[in-house]
Amino acid sequence: MFLSILVALCLWLHLALGVRGAPCEAVRIPMCRHMPWNITRMPNHLHHSTQENAILAIEQYEELVDVNCSAVLRFFLCAMYAPICTLEFLHDPIKPCKSVCQRARDDCEPLMKMYNHSWPESLACDELPVYDRGVCISPEAIVTDLPEDVKWIDITPDMMVQERPLDVDCKRLSPDRCKCKKVKPTLATYLSKNYSYVIHAKIKAVQRSGCNEVTTVVDVKEIFKSSSPIPRTQVPLITNSSCQCPHILPHQDVLIMCYEWRSRMMLLENCLVEKWRDQLSKRSIQWEERLQEQRRTVQDKKKTAGRTSRSNPPKPKGKPPAPKPASPKKNIKTRSAQKRTNPKRV
């Protein structure tokens, strides 16, 4: 009896720690690979425990998606079968909005009824959240906030990762071909890169879910800057590259400066990862103050320029136009008129 309880307890701890340590995974469902998000978590809203099970289930809707009966059908299906994994909702995947479900159903159900099918009960819209009353996603709600000058990159297999069977193309990739550029921790770098988050973290694990998808799980200790809330727990940093830059290893204590994109924390080539030092963290705070000061200066100059242009209207450029000379015909008429009015005396 005691042994069975101990085994059950160990199994529960293993599952609990496993879920906490690897909350997100790359989307591998073919229908959903071009969605605005590329990481998901299982189980999904239809209780599929793995993406392999979800792939088998979602295939039944491929023909319906191909006929393009609704502009939001693919989005809705992927939000159900491969829900987006975000920092704020690691334990409860976000559901699609009720309005998205209703649009997809109303658009496609007439076509389904022509073939004696109705909208499936598993995709019922009634239990889904309304946009202004709960948390949900819709195509209109997803925006891109990654700076345009940041290179979008893919991920490499040359790291300590959670193993999955590698594709043939993945095995051909060699770590030796990757040359990472060193990003120096200076004020000039900080001002030019304009990072959206700065954290002190410990690297917990690096997990691969394909040759072009790597998730670095870090334990956040301190938050110095963020554009959206970052929980002080284990969070995923997403890289999408054939080369792992900057290169990091598990168990390192580091300061990370990088970008947030679609509510996800990224780990990209121009990001800065340095061994943790108190002095460097103090510098980063000073650099952020300089960045904000620089922004205020630019805004003040724009306001001053706007007030000046309103109070002093622009003067016309160039010399004023010269008066046009009278035409020869008018001069002739004028002289003839003068002759008639003033005849010569004999």
Swiss-Prot record:
The GO biological-process annotations, alphabetized, read as:
bone morphogenesis; canonical Wnt signaling pathway; cell differentiation; negative regulation of canonical Wnt signaling pathway; negative regulation of cell population proliferation; negative regulation of non-canonical Wnt signaling pathway; negative regulation of sodium-dependent phosphate transport; negative regulation of transcription by RNA polymerase II
Annotated glycosylation sites: 38, 68, 116, 194, 240
Q: What is its main location?
A: secreted
**Residue span, FZ domain:** 19-139
| Induction section of the entry | Increased levels in failing myocardium. Up-regulated in several tumor types including ostomalacia-associated tumors and endometrial and breast carcinomas.
Q: Which cysteines are joined by disulfide bonds?
A: 24-85, 32-78, 69-108, 97-136, 101-125
Q: Where in the cell is it found?
A: Secreted
- What is the superkingdom listed in this entry's lineage? Eukaryota
Keywords, A to Z? Developmental protein, Differentiation, Disulfide bond, Glycoprotein, Secreted, Signal, Wnt signaling pathway
Free-text note on domains in this protein's UniProt record? The FZ domain is involved in binding with Wnt ligands.
Q: Which family does it belong to?
A: Belongs to the secreted frizzled-related protein (sFRP) family.
Q: What does this protein do?
A: Soluble frizzled-related proteins (sFRPS) function as modulators of Wnt signaling through direct interaction with Wnts. They have a role in regulating cell growth and differentiation in specific cell types. SFRP4 plays a role in bone morphogenesis. May also act as a regulator of adult uterine morphology and function. May also increase apoptosis during ovulation possibly through modulation of FZ1/FZ4/WNT4 signaling. Has phosphaturic effects by specifically inhibiting sodium-dependent phosphate uptake.
What this protein is called in its record is Secreted frizzled-related protein 4
Organism whose genome encodes this protein: Homo sapiens
From the UniProt record, report the name of the gene that encodes this protein: SFRP4
